[in-house]
C-alpha cells in the first residue's frame, strides 16, 4: 500500500492533520508582530563636538581629525563621514548592516576616550547619539501658539510632554526639534563696558566664579544628621543682575550696568514651521524591536490626554504619521490577497466546470496560507509588506498542487474508475511529482535566504515564507485533497452541459496540441536551435535592462532640501522657505507641510492627500514642484522622496570624490564633474556640498604690539572669544531644571566685521584699548564646511535623476566623468541610496547561479539522472526571456523585486517540466517509445499545466494593476511573473519535449537491458 493511501482510507486522520495546521496557524496570526519591512538593524552613531567660535578649519584640524583617526579603529563600521562647520564637528559612523550597535558603540566610546586629551581645552565633551532602524522618526507632533514664545513652548514640552511620550511602551526617544531651550542671556554693551573699564572676559570670569554650584555635605552628631546647602549659586534674574563683575576700590560694577540680563534662548538659529505656522516638533522614534503599528497606536491613544493638558493658547497634534503609508500598503496587499483568491477560484471553476471539483482547491488555498503563519512564527518572522507579498504569490503556488490532484482524479474517473479508486491511483501517481515540485520550489529560495546584504536581510522572510507555504501546500495536497476527492466526487451518469462544453474545448486543444507537437518534433533540431537563440537573448536583455535598487514608492510625501547663499542667516533662509511653502500649498494635492530652517539651508516635507483623492502621484508632483521651485531666485531647491527601502537617507544619487589633495584642487575637480552632470540632462537637480564661497574675515594680530603691551595671544583670543563666541559659562537652576548662562555682545554691536575692531580689551596695566590697536582685518573666501569621507578630503555630489536614465547608468556616467576630468589621486565612492545600490549590484547573478545549481542537484536526486534535470531546467531561460522582454520595454526595471520575481519564476516554470518528464519516464517504463512517451505525457499534462499557469498568472494580475500605497514594488514583481510565466509556458510546451528527445534518458532501453 502506498503511503498516500493511508490518508484516503482514514479520513479522520487526514482531517486531524488539517485541523492541526488550521489551529496552529490561527493561533500564530494573533501573535505575529506587524511591521513595514522585516527587522534589520541599520545603526548610525553620530559624534557631535562643540567648540564655540572656532572656524571650520580649526574644527577639522584640532577636533575632527584626531577623533576620526581613533574612531576608525573600531570594528563594525561600514564608512565614516564628517562635517566641520563653524563651532561644531559632526562625525557619522555608519555601521555595517545588522552589526551589533551596542558592541560598536562601546568600541567607539573607548576610542574617543583615548584622544580626549588631544582636543582643545575650550572644546565641549563629544556627545554620542545612536540611531537604530528607521532613518526618520515614525511620527512627528507639532506644537504652536500665537501667544507663547518658542522657548516657553519648548520648556513645557521638556517638562510635561516629552516625559509622557518617552514613557509610552516601545518609544525609543521623543526628540524635540526646532525648540529653543531657556537660557540666561547677558547681552553685553561694549560702550558701557569700555566706559566702566570692564572686558568681556571679566564678565565671563565673574559668572564662573560667583555662580558656583557646591555640595558641602552634612553635619553628623551622635543622634542627628543634617544636610548642608551652600548658597553659592544664583537662581533669579535679579541675582544675576546684581552680580559683581568688577571692584576697583570702593567702586563696584554690577552686571546690569554693562549688560541686559534676560531669560532668552540658547540659540536663535533654527525655525520650524507646520503649514506656515511657527512650531516646535517632537520626533517620536520607535525602538528597533518594537511593533511599529502598535507603538503608533499607543502614541495616538495618549495624544488626547496631552492635548487636554496644554496651556491656554497652545495647540498640538500629530503632523506626520509614517504608519499611515504602512497601514495603507498592508491594506492594499490584503485586498490583493482576497482578489487573488477570488480570481483563482473562478479560474478553477472555468477549467473544471464542476462546483464539487472547485471545493477541494478552495479549501486547500486558505488552509495552506493559514498554516504558513505558524511556520512564520517558528522562524521568528513578522507580518510585513514582503511576507504578505509572498502570501499573494503563494496563492498561485498552493493551489497548483490541489489543481493537479483534482484534475488527475477527474481524468481517471472519466476513464471509468470510482471516486475512491481514482483518488488512490491519482495520489500514487502524483506523490513523486508533487514531492519533487515542493522540494524544488523550496530549494529555489534557499540562495535568497543566504544572499546577505540588504536584499538578503529583507527578502529572507519573503523567500522562506513562500517556501513555508509551498511545504504546507504539499502536505495538504497529499493528505487532505485526495481524501476530499474520494468523498466529494460522485459517479455521475452524465456530466452537465457546462462540463461537457469545457471538456469538448479541452479535447480540441488536446488534439490540436498533440498533432502540432508531433509535427514539430519531426524537426526537433530547429526547436533546439530556437531555444539556444532565446538563451542568448536572455544574456543580452539582462545586460541592457534598466536597473535600480528598488522602484520609487508613492509614500504620500515629497521632501524638499534647499541651500541658500553662503553667508545667509536663518531670517534670510526663512524668506526662501516661505516662498517654497507658498508654491506647494497652492497645489490641489497639497494637504499640509513641515519645514525646518537654519542658516544657509532648509529642509521640509509636503504631505499629500490620500492616494484616492489626487490625480498626480508623488513622482509627478515631485517633478512639477522641482520646475516651479527652480524659479525662486537666490536658492537651490531639490525635490525628492524617501528611499523605497530602509537603511539609507538623503538624495537618491550621492557620489563622493575622495582625495588627499587640497580643497581648492578638489573643488576644481568637483566643479568640473558638476558642470558635466548639469549639462548631461540626466538630473532634475544636482549640487556639491563643497562650496568655497563663504566670506571669512581674518583678524590679523600684530604680535609685536601685543608683546609691547605686555599681553599674550591667549589673553587677546580669550577676550574676543568671550565677547563673540556665544559659549556658555555654567548653569543656573529654575524650578528643578538647569539652564545655561551665556554672555555675548548684543547683536547691534556685531552686525559687521569692522565693529570687532572697536571692541575694548584690557591690558595687564588695566588700560582699555580698542582691538584695532593691535589687529587688522583681512578678507578671504573659505569652504562653507570641511568634509571628510573615510578620513579623506571629500566632495559629495548629490542629485535627483530624471526618469530617463537608470540608477546603474547614472552612476557609471558619474564614474566615467570623474575619470575624464580628474588627474591621478582622486577616487570615487558612494553614500546613501547609491551606496546601497552598489553593494547589492552583482549579487543577483550569484544567487541565480546557486538557485539553478541547487535545483539541478535536487532534481538529479529525485530522478536518479543528470539528464532529466537539464531537460526540466531548459524551461528556465525561456521564462526569463519572456520577463526580460517587458523589463526592456520599460514596463518596470531590474530591481530587487523583479530579481526575486525572476528567481520565483524559475521555480514556477520548472514545475511544468517536472510534470511532463516524470510522466514520460513512466510511459517509457511501461513500454512506450521515447517519442510516443513524450508526446502523450505532454498532451495529458497539458490541461493541469494550463490550469496551474492560468491560476498563477491571473492570481498575480492584481499585482500587475496595483495602485495606491506600495504599488510600485508589487507591480514590478507581478509584471515579471505574469509575463515570464505566460511566455515561458508557451515555449516550454514545445522546447521541453524537443530537449527530451535530444538528451532525455531512454528508459525503455534501460528497462530492456535490465530484463
Q: Where is each model-derived feature located?
A:
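Small-residue-enriched core segments of transmembrane alpha-helices in multipass membrane transport
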Residues: 108, 346, 358-379, 447, ...
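Membrane-proximal extracytoplasmic
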Residues: 1-341, 383, 457, 643-645, ...
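C-terminal transmembrane helical bundles of large multi-pass transporters
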Residues: 322, 388, 631-1006
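Signature of alpha-helical transmembrane segments and their immediate interfacial
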Residues: 1-31, 430, 498-549, 606, ...
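Juxtamembrane segments of multi-pass membrane proteins
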Residues: 512, 531-628, 632-639, 672
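Interfacial segments of transmembrane alpha-helices in multi-pass membrane proteins
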Residues: 2-8, 12, 287-291, 327-384, ...
